[in-house]
Amino acid sequence: MDREELQAVFDQKCASGYDQQWSKIAPLREALHLLVGAVLSDLRDDARILCVGAGTGPELIYLAERFPGWRFVAVEPSAPMLDVCRRKAEERGIAARCEFHEGYLESLPPGEEFDAATSLLVSQFLLDREARTGFFRGIADRLRLGGFLVNADLSSDTSPAAYQSLRGIWYRMMQAGELTPEAIEKMRAAHDRDVALLPPEVVGGIISAGGFDSPVQFLQTGLIRAWYARRV
């Protein structure tokens, strides 16, 4: 999926109902955030955190409330999604510790190195493997030596039987989340067309090639897997 397509998908209509749409499967997000917080919990009290593809800001909000001394930079190309993120931060009284950058990582002005970066369900939209490696390299360039990357993406073993079985469970879960059959069918088509759903070892190799040590997988919830790695 190219940049224009991504911005068309995550438009004003999407942003206004995004959090509500996924509220029924919030336990997946909550488990991810709980473990992300554990991975990063030893950072300094005034750590700087880069949130790449911040969307409506769920991980930023969670981490900012859990770690009241941390400072955040949210990078998000969709203006409507970033507006929701900013509004939520203002409502919770944490906006003073946040910067909001509309655009991509390469357009973020140079600044102090970050202690950690999050990229949750972002790199999966980069279908070209070289571009995906470059995405992680861009994050590594913003981190201090030894800084953490926490990354989550849709990922699955690609043996036909295992993948189809897990995929079936995934869509049945979406039905329980009250998505309409039409919405689920659109999701199926998008996964086939617009998501680079790769085996976990391949995703780990791409992260390493982007300037990180060997990633450690710390979570799997259905098709979502998450890793942490450190900049080398």
Where are these regions (language model features)?
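Class I SAM-dependent methyltransferase SAM/SAH-binding core
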Residues: R48-V52, T56-S107
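A short glycine-rich, Lys/Arg-flanked "PGG" loop and its adjoining helix->strand segment in the class I
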Residues: T133-L145
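Conserved class I S-adenosyl-L-methionine
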Residues: M1-R44, F148-A176
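A short acidic, Gly/Pro-enriched loop at the edge of an enzyme's catalytic core
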Residues: P109-A117
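Short alpha-helix
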Residues: R193-G210
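A short beta-strand submotif of the Rossmann-like class I SAM-dependent methyltransferase core
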Residues: S119-S123
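Core SAM-dependent methyltransferase catalytic element
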Residues: G210-V232
